[in-house]
């Protein structure tokens, strides 16, 4: 069952990615290994309520809900930021500026949105992404879950 932890009740020392004071964190069971910074989505391969209590690495679809805050193995409980500030969220290397809207991309990443996109906006970039595949950026997540 997903467990809510509103208003960032977890100590910042308990998660590997820094979140802001108003961040909302929910615990889910994961059905595959995840890396801190991966965007995650609801696991629609499950049935009944398990579809909203279990997550997998996000893909370019409308099921993505937040960012994994820790690296975990398949079957573990993972804390996911579903709203607010997150440092080091995975991108596909196309985030060009602070303020870019973010939509789901493949392999647990997000990409810069465009006017023609039909995927949901997940949040906005607070900086240009950095690194070399995988890329990361600080983001603000809009609540969807």
Where are each of the predicted segments found?
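Surface-exposed, low-hydrophobicity beta-strand/loop segments enriched in small/polar/acidic residues
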Residues: 1-145
